[in-house]
Amino acid sequence: MSHDDMSNSSGFNEAAASFSWNGPKKAINPYLDPAEVAPESALSNLITLYAADNEQEQLRREALSEQVWERYFFNESRDPVQREMEQDKLISRAKLAHEQQRFNPDMVILADVNAQPSHISKPLMQRIEYFSSLGRPKAYSRYLRETIKPCLERLEHIRDSQLSTSFRFMASHEGLDGLLILPEMSQEQVKRLSTLVAAHMSMCLDAACGDLYATDDVKPEEIRKTWERVAAETLRLDVIPPAFEQLRRKRNRRKPVPYELIPGSLARMLCADWWYRKLWKMRCEWREEQLRAVCLVSKKASPYVSYEAVMHKREQRRKSLEFFRSHELVNEDGDTLDMEDVVNASSSNPAHRRNEMMACVKGLELIAEMRGDCAVFYTITCPSRFHSTLNNGRPNPTWTNATVRQSSDYLVGMFAAFRKAMHKAGLRWYGVRVAEPHHDGTVHWHLLCFMRKKDRRAITALLCKFAIREDREELGNNTGPRFKSELINPRKGTPTSYIAKYISKNIDGRGLAGEISKETGKSLRDNAEYVNAWASLHRVQQFRFFGIPGRQAYRELRLLAGQAARQQGDKKAGAPVLDNPRLDAILAAADAGCFATYIMKQGGVLVPRKYHLIRTAYEINEEPTAYGDHGIRIYGIWSPIAEGKICTHAVKWKMVRKAVDVQEAVADQGACAPWTRGNNCPLAENLNQQAKDKSADGDTRTDITRMDDKELHDYLHSMSKKERRELAARLRLVKPKRRKDYKQRITDHQRQQLVYELKSRGFDGSEKEVDLLLRGGSIPSGAGLRIFYRNQRLQEDDKWRNLY
């Protein structure tokens, strides 16, 4: 800058400073001079809060948008680049696993086990982990190759046999692909699937009808052709349509076609509830056969039937009891009967069922003594191709994927062929047959038969011939594994004593708590629950009498005798009830409970049914079922030597739900009682409060804590029955105190067995659970049950058992 410029600028500054309005202004800086900042107002604070809320909402929307974008666009199924990267990772991982499997074939078996459904893979992996924890690599590898691998191969064969070609074709329809995984489904899933199947059948019916019903002149044969179309679809699902035998085409039909059965049959095939029952039964059977294929039903795992099936049976029984307790029977006159009492008084009660069967066997024994017949005890077993598991828990190499039902059908067919040959040879017998399961669920029979002494050898030889004729080469000279016979010696025991144990252990195990099964190693009373679950699941008839009159007429006669006794009132006991003396003698024998007299008065043993004097009468039910048809029910009794029928079910009872009395529920403090501060207290507090109330009312109890032994003894013996009951009720509420240091002592081997059994039942088998059981605690196992460890055994209590 030149000198002239500097002089000019200085002159300008001096001129500007001479005027106040032209002076420099101070810069605005709120951080340096806060005193001049405008004060905050309520409006400014509100604006600030709104701005912060808007900022938070904007951040939330951006985060949500990123989540939606990542979920639906930036994933392996949407983004091609990421999908390709994930596929490369999976391919490299599969190549690595394949290379490892080339050097270690055991990993292939483990991968196959993990690929199975949970009801198969979980118990198998628990067993594999147990063998792996033993620290014996060779035994672990041998177990995988010799036990697990054959089990998986058998499982695939079972699945192929279950899923027939027609069944797979039905699963190819839209919405019915769940049929392929039917054993893996739960009840809710089966219900949804049954609805879809019923809808498919409805569409098949619409397609079959077409324009058939456009006119009124439809012939019955055309309707039957429509039924055949729907029935063919039902048969593809391996389900027999209702009334199939009566309505199917036959070459030599002797009777006219019952066209009246078509509406009820079609209504069932179009009903979702009917399909649910069929599919659920099929699901349970298929699932059980798959568990048998992998050796999970045996003496080493769960005898007779799987543990899952036992738990399902317990839950079903609990629901049935709740249903019986919540309903009652009402007749036209307004009389009511408690449904639980009616069920317990019928033959559904295991105790009554056992007593009736023992009385019948005793009657056969008395008749045999009177006739001079001998008694023989037979045992018949299926060939080895029906047995899935060996006694050591390993797969049976000769098993041909035969099911439990097929083993039962084999014995039924063999017995029918033998009976035909026996009658052709002029031989006769009578007795009772008991069906029992082996440890793997395969059926075998025990027979108590009475026959003439001169026919015993011929009948035994003929029965042995039919029992061992299939797969004869596997027996050699020893036919004992397939057929056994024992002549009952009266010196050792009566025929009733021989069969008593088999009847009891297949019903409720009464009187067999101390006996241990040689096949399973468990108490026969505990095995009874498993046997009942086995018979219910596979629909096996456990008991069958032959050669004697029917027992249903015996029950109807006893019912008639009870009704007559109530109507006679003050008349002389033993007065005749029926006009015909022969029929009245049969009724008197049934009323007295003497099966021997009842059988002989009916005509005796080995008499055809058409010659029995009293038979059961049936009638068509007046009220239609849910499917529009009328079923058949028991009417009473009838006799060919007397006119008319005698009704034993004249009163019509209707099942209704019980009405809940709120005041009574509050007094009983049951489940229906309203939740108040009174019934919500623990039992001990309620007891103490009741004691205080009674003390306030003047009811003073003697303090027994200050008495010595003699005074306490005299006081307890001087109490009335009511006071004793009250004291016993109070003592039940006092829980016994267990020592803090209490713990059962077991060996390491017993601890490993306990852990293994806990894992087999679906528990973790951790140290915490083991210590809890050893200290006397219990673990809930479902359906109101708890497991505990006592006497070196893992036991399970059942609070419903004493009701059955």
Swiss-Prot record:
Gene Ontology biological process: DNA replication
Keywords, comma-separated and alphabetical: DNA replication, Endonuclease, Hydrolase, Nuclease
Top-level taxon: Bacteria
Matches recorded under Pfam families: Phage_GPA
Enzyme Commission number(s): 3.1.-.-
InterPro entries recorded: Replication_gene_A-like
Active site: 498 (o-(5'-phospho-dna)-tyrosine intermediate), 502 (o-(5'-phospho-dna)-tyrosine intermediate)
UniProt family annotation: Belongs to the phage GPA family.
Function: Possible endonuclease which induces a single-strand cut and initiates DNA replication.
Name this protein carries in UniProt: Probable replication endonuclease from prophage-like region
Species per Swiss-Prot/TrEMBL record: Escherichia coli O6:H1 (strain CFT073 / ATCC 700928 / UPEC)
Lineage: Bacteria, Pseudomonadati, Pseudomonadota, Gammaproteobacteria, Enterobacterales
